[in-house]
Regions:
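Active-site loop immediately N-terminal to the catalytic Tyr-X3-Lys motif
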Residues: 10-16, 38-39, 107
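Residue(s) in the substrate-gating loop at a strand-loop-helix junction
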Residues: 5
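Short C-terminal tail/terminal secondary-structure segment
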Residues: 10, 101-102, 113-126
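Short, flexible catalytic-loop segment of classical short-chain dehydrogenase/reductase
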Residues: 48-58, 62-67
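A conserved structural motif in NAD(P)-dependent oxidoreductases
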Residues: 74, 85-97
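Conserved SDR Rossmann-fold cofactor-binding beta-strand/turn motif
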Residues: 42-52, 105, 118-120
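Short, small/polar-rich loop/turn modules that mediate ligand/substrate recognition or access, typified
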Residues: 37, 42, 112-114
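Active-site helix of classical SDR
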Residues: 21, 29
Length: 126
């Protein structure tokens, strides 16, 4: 199981280094799936959008999106984050990603390999 992001699927301005790395994750996943399939080893990846973790939910991010506020918080960042999603949520929760990983690792997905599963509240649709 590999973890990419929505950046594995599309370009985002001013983040070429990040996008290149995340596209690489998807390429590795596909190569591993082809190479290891003969041994019945499945390889997949999950691709979240903004996740409610310290990596996203921090003062630097809040100030990046709300430089006009002295002490912006999550509630100030939420409208900007939600604009990137099709579903009306500003971010996904870590357990949403975990649940996708559990599905892909389970017998319920025993014939699923080489799949990049977005957990992105519809961000890739925009």
């Amino acid at each position: 199981m590999l973890t990419g992001s929505v950046g594995s699927h599309k370009a985002l301005a001013y983040t070429g280094h990040y996008i290149a790395a995340k596209h690489g994750v998807m390429g590795l996943m596909r190569s591993f799936a082809v190479e290891l399939g003969q041994y019945r080893i499945r390889v997949n990846s999950v691709h979240p959008s903004q996740v409610n973790t310290p990596m996203t939910m921090n003062e630097v991010t809040f100030k990046l999106f709300r430089p006009d506020l002295e002490n912006p918080g999550p509630e100030d960042f939420a409208p900007f984050s939600q604009m990137t999603h099709t579903l009306p949520v500003p971010w996904v929760e870590a357990n949403d990603i975990s649940n996708a990983v559990l599905f892909l690792a389970s017998d319920e997905s025993r014939y699923v390999t080489g799949v990049s599963l977005p957990v992105d509240a519809g961000a890739l649709l925009k």
